[in-house]
Amino acid sequence: NLSLMDENGFIPADGLINANQQIKAMRAQQEAASKKAITSNGWTWLGPGNIGGRVRSVVIHPTNTNIMWAGSVTGGIWKTTNGGASWAIMDDFMTNMAVSTMVIDPTNPEVLYAGTGETGYYSDYGPPRGAGVFKTTNGGTTWTQLASTNTPDWYYVNRLAINPANPLILLAATDSGTW
């Protein structure tokens, strides 16, 4: 029996404490191992270093590799024009900054889409809820929410893809299905 409950349906306090200690130890071990792996494989950290959050998506301009956008679950969307030497926030006023996925229009690099909401992240407070899909037509300077994605079905957008044969077709994988 893997349950922590006793015969009366209660969970002993020390059982929860032990479980939390094990979780912290596993996370510390994973973090230490991942830092070793990155350094030993010759990767060089380029930033950004002045924000919090997890980068979940990086999009590279199709004809100028010095231009990139990074989507962070709690930090929003950032852009570099110098190959990552410096980054600038692009969406401080977007209604939701929980960016989990991004795509760039293959025919017009000024058009990008950002999906919001993060799944697979569990904490005492639950995963950061999104607000659907946002679009920019000016390289990220301004973003507009796609009105059709302003529903609970779009709280957690996992992946976006643009049909290469028809860039007007945007595909999305969410917690509630594929659209």
Predicted regions mapped to residue ranges:
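Extracellular glycan-interacting surfaces
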Residues: 1-179
